[in-house]
């Protein structure tokens, strides 16, 4: 029993033709029998109907697909399995021993979770007869080869005994819908047959009418040819046949096993005795059938064929006896009797003659066939030969494989179907082997076989490749056979041949000639109707419609609207496997007038996707115009066209008015200088101060508490960390600012003097020409005590004076060597020589003045504060007589080294505060440090810069804009949304927004250079003329994204939204109320009931509106469901949500990860191939029920668990997509273990394996679309989205990348780094020897090729493989060097 357990999701992988849609829609209105030629796609109509039945809602009922044969049953099941991969379907046939299923429990368990059952008619009839299945359980009953529903056939008995009685008793709702499929509704050419068939099936027989012209393009009628052969001359036959007939005539019945007495002698007059007397025993019946078959082979094929058949059959029997010699049961005795009987035949002598290649004695009929086949020498040949008896099939196929005229031209095979009947196989002469022929039809479809000899089993139903030649070795039995066989020859310019003997040439041939003439007349009549239709199309009908837009004067008329409608569809995003052209279909009324319907691509909103014309027309041309006009007007009224009547995608609503292209380098405002305001404030100061404390490695430094004084309110300052050396970390902490109530001018003057003293103390030269500092510093003393403090600490003394007072080195001031231009030193100790010369052992003040960053190398310098001793420090010996000693102690003097850092921090804080008070006044930042970071350009070389925040803000901006566009433009297709988002978030738009807002003046680009630092002065700031600076356009865009990231960190999505609005007014100020927007949207009528509960549980989310999940699983190629939009909109939203979930995780992990590495990690974990891999891996567990035979001969229901992957739920209509999907799944099976090992145990990201996987985009699209669906249904709950990403395994891998430091650098980047940029990659698309597109990548260095990679399926694979080989090459070369 074949089974397909999946979800309830459906999707057709074939895009139906218009005439198939016509028949499908007719089947929705009433029960019909679809009558179309073989090969025109009747099964596709059934698939459409099945999909509609599953998605139609209402009570859950079974769809039962009935076929006349087991082979056809298995074939149709495979069609359903491939076209509707997620449907739960199964087959029930005689191969399952269904006749022995005698328990209701077995049937109930098997069918409880099934949606589609495929079986033969007899299976369903017996199940209904015994009450295991009730007609009321069925929702749709499909009769393949519906012409069988006549007389006492099981197909008709289903209708007679169950359907019609239930219909009469309980009404139409109690019986299933009926869909019949046939190529020949009339079997015996009787006019009454069609009416009888319609009555039996309670259906109307229909063929396409409106789209008949399209149907004719797919129904190629063959040329009908007779093959005339001489009449069969019944002769005595060959040596083997004559010997066989003689042995049969003279056989001694006493040796027959049935003649041997068992349990006593046979009683005279018993049944066994009578059978024995008339030679009706088993063995004699076997021999008789063998003789009859041999005689038939001789008559049909000739002496050679009959001898070959007899000899081969005898050898097969002997082989069977040898293989079963150990089990001598009654059947073996029968075989032994037959073998002994046949041993009288001269097999060895006949076989010797058969080996002679010149001894092909053929019948006239076979000779005529071979001569006919000899005319065909086409490498693309495919043909069928229909014969009457099964025995002829195998022998003729073998003969054609051996004959000199055919053996090298045709690849022959035999096919007689899968059914073995209820009787056991004959022991002699029956060559049928169901297992050997199981792959025959696949071989024929693939071209491995090109000529099949068969019986009537291939007349109908079974999918057979369109043939070049069809030969009837025997005349068709009836009109049905004639039509069915003719339908197999449906290649263009095909041939349909019927063999006749000269004996009946004037009888039967005339009958077929008359029939052919009738067919020709029908063809001619059809051609006449087509010419009449073409003439009707030439009639110019006036379509009086017009669309006018007064605001622009735009006008569209019916004469131009078709072109415009095609243009609208053409500018929609191109999608692989999808044809975006509009599809027109038609219907006719009783007067023959036509009304049109147009269906737009599935990415268009369902409300305007299917538009019907309003009027009836004489010609299709006029109907197309009027229908296209109605569609275009609907698009305009729906908001998908602008006032110029053009698609919004070429002129989005939110496109900025200024389209000027900005250069990459811009002249922008100079960096905002807060000291200008402070300089002006000193004219009327409101003096404030704050205390500054110094700590060293977490411990307070004695005596180092200073004050910062300003002319206005001071902003709170964050602590400053300074790196004195590798082992010493200093921290400057700032107290809360406070106002100084009374400050005299004299005090301010003293403060300026103190500030000058601090700044000058650690420097060698007096760099100060003025002391009108904007910022002032002083000791932690009342302002009234500054004068005394200056007396004690200002100035200097000679080194001898300090030495004579016994001043200890640690309490001394800065030592200045007068012989070296007052170079400052730290005093380490006094040294007095034997001659009385006083020297000072000194150590230099650190030359490194920027203490914001740790030193690259340990310079080993010590200072008096930390009292560190380093033997490696550079020591200077200075004579005391050439030195002076500053009065200001070293412990206080070094504060002058920190003033540039304090002023720089104060400046950046004032700039950030000014930005928050102006442009960002509505945001309300709580932590100004976020703003400082966001506006700090990398060129400023600060402790932080905007790059990390920009990484975060980029995803937040994308998320905010995507959500707004998605929810505020529910009518927009994905292409409009994507272009709208790109217009808003692209760098040129952000750059223009930054300039318009004046953000350029707040971006900090000046680097702090303490060695050349000059304190800001009042005199240089007041009246300074504004200047310009140059800045990269990208920096302006980056800072906006960084500020959005800063706002998010400061106050979540609400502040990020406000911040975005400050720069982009088209973005809402407040986040959308998603729950209220969801409740406003209409729930569709799509198949919510088909969504599997197991799937939702495994997704980690249960949908309130299951339509969203169905939409998320609907590929753009899915055309059969016109009420559900494709997943593209949800995929657009999910793409942004994926970033919004992943990026914060990466950002928050550690600030030690560089922005560049964060970007590499993000790109690696959201890589489409990785998402596609997780999609292939993600599956749910479902129970599968099947019936198995137990050892005691009973039947039992067995349940087992199987995995159903997420991709199976995707709904689509594309054969190409299925082919690509299956190829990708094959690659997945081949690469799966390698990829899993790399993901969960390897040190590096599996770039090469994932590129070889080459997962089609729709695999990753499903992940993103489901993510979008969860977000919408949950009302914008990102945590629900996180749970889904956790379920598929993505978040656990992200954590592993972060925790284990997985190397995610792309191999090409590594190769470029190792080669120092000298490796040049050249990627080309080429064709292989079979004409398939492949990729080749070469790598050259210094004009020499070092790597060549070929035969890759995609450019990514070629490039990655080439990069890895380049890395190996460079590493080997380095080892040699």
From Swiss-Prot:
Residues 914-1052, 1092-1275 form the RNase III domain. It holds the Pfam family Helicase_C. GO terms for biological process: defense response to virus; regulation of defense response to virus; siRNA processing. ATP binds at residues 36-43. Its cofactor is Mg(2+); Mn(2+). Its EC number is 3.1.26.-, 3.6.4.-. Keywords: Antiviral defense, Antiviral protein, ATP-binding, Helicase, Hydrolase, Magnesium, Manganese, Metal-binding, Nucleotide-binding, Repeat, RNA-binding. A motif (DEAH box) lies at residues 144-147. Residues 561-655 form the Dicer dsRNA-binding fold domain. Residues 23-203 form the Helicase ATP-binding domain. This is Dicer-like protein 2. It comes from Aspergillus oryzae (strain ATCC 42149 / RIB 40) (Yellow koji mold).
């Amino acid at each position: 029993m074949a089974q397909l357990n999946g979800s309830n999701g459906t999707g057709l992988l074939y895009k139906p033709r218009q005439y198939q849609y016509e028949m499908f829609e007719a089947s929705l209105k009433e029960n019909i029998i679809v009558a179309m030629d073989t090969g025109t796609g009747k099964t596709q109509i059934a698939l459409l109907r099945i999909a509609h039945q599953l998605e139609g809602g209402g009570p859950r009922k079974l769809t039962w697909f009935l076929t006349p044969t087991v082979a056809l049953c298995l074939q149709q099941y495979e069609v359903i399995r491939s076209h509707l991969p997620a449907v739960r379907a199964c087959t029930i046939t005689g191969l399952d021993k269904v006749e022995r299923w005698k328990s209701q429990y077995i049937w109930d368990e098997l069918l409880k979770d099934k949606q589609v059952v495929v079986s033969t008619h007899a299976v369903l009839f017996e199940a209904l007869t015994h009450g295991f299945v009730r007609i009321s359980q069925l929702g749709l009953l499909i009769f393949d080869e519906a012409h069988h529903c006549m007389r006492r056939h099981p197909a008709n008995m289903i209708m007679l005994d169950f359907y019609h009685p239930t219909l009469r008793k309980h009404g139409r709702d109690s019986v299933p819908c009926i869909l019949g499929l046939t190529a020949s509704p009339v079997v015996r050419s009787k006019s009454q047959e069609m009416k009888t068939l319609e009555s039996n099936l309670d259906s109307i027989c229909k063929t396409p009418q409106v789209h008949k012209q399209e149907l004719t393009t797919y129904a190629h009628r063959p040329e009908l040819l007779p093959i005339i052969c001489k009449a069969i001359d019944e002769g005595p036959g060959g040596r083997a046949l004559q010997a066989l007939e003689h042995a049969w005539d003279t056989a001694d019945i006493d040796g027959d096993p049935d003649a041997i007495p068992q349990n006593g002698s046979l009683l005279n007059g018993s049944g066994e005795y009578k059978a024995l007397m008339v030679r009706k025993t088993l063995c004699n019946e076997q021999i008789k059938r063998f003789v009859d078959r041999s005689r038939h082979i001789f008559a049909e094929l000739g002496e050679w064929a009959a001898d070959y058949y007899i000899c081969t059959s005898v050898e097969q029997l002997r082989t069977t006896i040898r293989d079963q010699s150990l089990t001598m049961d009654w059947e073996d005795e029968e075989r032994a009797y037959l073998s002994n009987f046949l041993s009288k035949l001269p097999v060895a002598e006949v076989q010797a003659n058969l080996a002679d290649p010149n001894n092909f004695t053929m019948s006239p009929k076979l000779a005529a066939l071979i001569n006919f086949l000899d005319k065909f020498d086409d490498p693309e040949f495919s043909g069928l030969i229909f014969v009457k008896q099964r025995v002829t099939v195998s022998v003729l196929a073998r003969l054609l494989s051996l004959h000199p005229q055919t053996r090298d031209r045709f690849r022959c095979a035999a096919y007689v179907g899968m059914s073995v009947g209820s009787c056991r196989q004959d022991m002699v002469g029956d060559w049928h082997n169901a297992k050997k022929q199981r792959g025959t039809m696949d071989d024929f479809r693939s071209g491995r076989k090109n000529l099949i000899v068969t019986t009537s089993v291939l007349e109908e139903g079974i999918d057979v490749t369109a043939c070049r030649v069809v030969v009837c070795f025997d005349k068709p039995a009836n009109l049905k056979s004639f039509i069915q066989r003719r339908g197999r020859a449906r290649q263009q310019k095909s041939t349909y041949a019927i063999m006749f003997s000269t004996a009946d040439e004037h009888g039967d041939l005339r009958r077929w000639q008359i029939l052919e003439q009738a067919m020709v007349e029908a063809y001619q009549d059809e051609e006449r109707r087509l010419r009449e239709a073409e003439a009707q199309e030439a009639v110019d009908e006036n379509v009086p419609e017009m669309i006018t837009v007064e605001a622009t004067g735009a006008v569209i008329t019916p004469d131009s609207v078709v072109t415009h409608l095609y243009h609208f569809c053409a500018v929609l995003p191109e999608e692989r496997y999808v044809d975006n052209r509009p599809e027109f279909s038609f219907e006719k009324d009783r007067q023959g007038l036509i009304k049109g319907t147009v269906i737009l691509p599935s990415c268009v909103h369902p409300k305007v996707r299917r538009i019907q014309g309003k009027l009836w027309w004489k010609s299709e041309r006029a109907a197309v115009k009027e229908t296209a006009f109605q569609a275009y007007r609907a698009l305009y009224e729906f908001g998908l066209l602008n006032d110029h009547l053009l698609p919004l995608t070429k002129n989005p609503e939110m496109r900025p008015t200024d389209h000027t292209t900005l250069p990459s380098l811009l002249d922008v405002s100079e960096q905002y200088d807060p000291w200008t305001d402070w300089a002006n404030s000193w004219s009327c100061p409101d003096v404030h101060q704050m205390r500054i404390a110094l700590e060293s490695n977490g411990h307070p430094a004695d005596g180092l508490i200073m004050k910062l004084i300003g002319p206005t309110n001071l902003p709170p300052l964050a602590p400053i960390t300074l790196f004195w050396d590798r082992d010493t970390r200093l921290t400057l902490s700032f107290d809360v600012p406070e106002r100084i109530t009374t400050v005299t001018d004299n005090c301010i003057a003293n403060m300026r003097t103190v500030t000058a003293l601090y700044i000058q103390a650690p420097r060698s030269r007096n760099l100060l020409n003025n002391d009108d500092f904007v910022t002032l510093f002083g000791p932690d003393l009342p302002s009234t005590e500054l004068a005394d403090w200056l007396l004690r600490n200002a100035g200097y003394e000679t080194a001898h004076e300090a030495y004579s007072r016994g001043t200890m080195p640690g309490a001394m001031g800065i030592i200045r060597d007068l012989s070296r231009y007052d170079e400052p030193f730290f005093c380490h100790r006094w040294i007095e020589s034997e001659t009385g010369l006083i020297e000072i052992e000194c150590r230099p003040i650190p030359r490194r003045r920027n203490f914001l960053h740790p030193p690259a190398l340990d310079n080993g310098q010590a200072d008096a504060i930390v009292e560190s001793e380093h033997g490696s420090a550079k020591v200077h010996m200075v004579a005391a007589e050439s030195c002076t000693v500053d009065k200001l102690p070293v412990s206080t003097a070094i504060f002058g080294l920190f003033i540039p850092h304090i002023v720089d921090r104060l400046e950046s804080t004032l700039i950030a505060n000014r930005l928050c008070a102006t442009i960002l006044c509505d945001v309300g930042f709580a932590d100004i440090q976020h703003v400082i970071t966001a506006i700090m350009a990398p060129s400023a070389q600060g402790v932080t810069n905007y790059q990390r925040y920009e990484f975060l803000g980029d995803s937040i901006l994308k998320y905010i804009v995507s959500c707004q566009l998605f929810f505020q433009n529910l009518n927009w297709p994905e292409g409009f949304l994507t272009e709208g988002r790109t217009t808003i978030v692209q760098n040129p738009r952000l750059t223009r927004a930054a300039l318009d807002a004046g953000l350029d003046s707040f971006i900090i680009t000046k680097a702090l250079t303490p060695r050349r630092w000059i304190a800001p002065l009042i005199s240089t700031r007041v009246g300074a003329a504004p200047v310009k600076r140059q800045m990269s356009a990208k920096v302006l865009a980056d800072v906006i994204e960084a500020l959005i990231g800063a706002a998010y960190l400061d106050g979540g999505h609400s502040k990020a939204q406000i911040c975005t609005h400050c720069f982009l007014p088209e973005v809402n100020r407040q986040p959308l109320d998603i729950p209220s927007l969801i409740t406003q949207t209409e729930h569709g009528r799509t198949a919510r009931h088909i969504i599997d509960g197991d799937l939702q549980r495994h997704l980690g989310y249960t949908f309130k509106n299951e339509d969203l999940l169905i939409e998320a699983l609907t590929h753009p190629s899915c055309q059969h469901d016109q009420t559900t939009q494709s997943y593209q909109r949800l995929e657009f939203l999910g793409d942004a949500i994926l970033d919004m979930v992943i990026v914060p995780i990466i950002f928050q992990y550690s600030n030690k990860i560089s922005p560049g590495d964060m970007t590499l990690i993000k790109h690696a974990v959201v890589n489409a191939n990785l998402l596609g891999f997780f999609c292939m891996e993600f599956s749910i567990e479902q129970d599968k029920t099947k019936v198995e035979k137990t050892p005691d001969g009973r039947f039992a229901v067995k349940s087992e668990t199987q995995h159903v992957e997420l991709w199976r739920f995707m709904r689509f209509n594309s054969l190409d997509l299925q082919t690509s999907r299956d190829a990708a799944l094959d690659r997945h099976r081949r690469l799966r273990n390698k990829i899993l090992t790399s993901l969960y145990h390897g040190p590096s990201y599996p770039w090469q394996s994932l590129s070889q996987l080459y997962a089609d985009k729709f695999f990753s699209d499903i992940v993103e679309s489901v993510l979008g669906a969860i977000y919408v249904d949950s009302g914008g709950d990102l945590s629900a989205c996180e749970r889904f990403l956790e379920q598929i395994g993505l978040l656990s891998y992200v954590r592993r990348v972060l925790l284990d430091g997985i190397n995610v650098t792309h191999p090409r980047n590594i190769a470029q780094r190792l080669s120092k940029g000298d490796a040049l990659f050249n990627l080309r698309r080429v064709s292989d020897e079979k004409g398939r597109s492949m990729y080749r990548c070469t790598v050259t260095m210094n004009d020499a090729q070092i790597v060549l990679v070929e035969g890759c399926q995609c450019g990514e694979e070629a490039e990655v493989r080439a990069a890895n080989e380049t890395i190996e090459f460079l590493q080997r070369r380095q080892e040699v060097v």
